[in-house]
Design a protein with these regions (language model features):
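Short amphipathic, positively biased membrane-proximal segments
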Residues: 1-167
Length: 167
């Protein structure tokens, strides 16, 4: 799946937010892609035939939100970049759109074509916001040296890799 590979590729860089999130990014990118695909299926398919798309969207949304939460709580200081500025706004929008789209798809999407289409559009938009939010957070972390220096010092204090970025 291209989404997973993209997550692996950006995590294998020296960009602090992306590198520190290397365990979660492939899951986030795969789940976000599944969520968007399910959302697109909800938009395109008749309500009676969109059950598999709704299920894929709901599962993708749950995994996406869980992996994002895990990443945000495990990154330490670098997680600041996911909550501030443009990245923070995009990540907040991604959570709201993804959750609303998933709930709307499950609750209303099986009865109303308009609700299914609106929920599907919210899921696709949430996926886009996730990708661009992570991109912006990586850019922000690359421009501020403390997001490189502080994690390196913390690894050294724990007896880690003498400040080198580990993969």
């Amino acid at each position: 799946m291209v989404g997973t590979y993209t997550g692996v590729l950006i995590a294998d860089t020296a960009t602090p937010t992306w590198h520190e999130g290397q365990r979660e990014l492939p899951y986030i990118f795969a789940a976000s892609a599944a969520t968007a695909a399910g959302g697109l299926g909800m938009i395109a398919a008749p309500v009676a035939e969109a059950g598999p798309a709704r299920r894929m969207a709901a599962i993708g949304a749950a995994v996406d939100l869980a992996a994002e939460y895990r990443m945000e709580t495990s990154l330490g200081i670098v997680a600041e970049t996911l909550h501030e500025g443009r990245a923070g706004r995009l990540m907040k929008a991604s959570k709201v759109l993804t959750a609303a789209g998933a709930v709307g798809g499950i609750v209303l999407g099986r009865r109303s074509r308009i609700a299914a289409m609106a929920s599907g559009a919210a899921l696709v938009a949430g996926s886009v916001c996730t990708k661009f939010g992570i991109f912006e957070a990586g850019q922000a972390s690359a421009h501020d040296p403390r997001y490189t220096v502080v994690p390196q010092r913390q690894r050294m204090e724990r007896g880690g890799s003498h400040g080198a970025v580990s993969t």
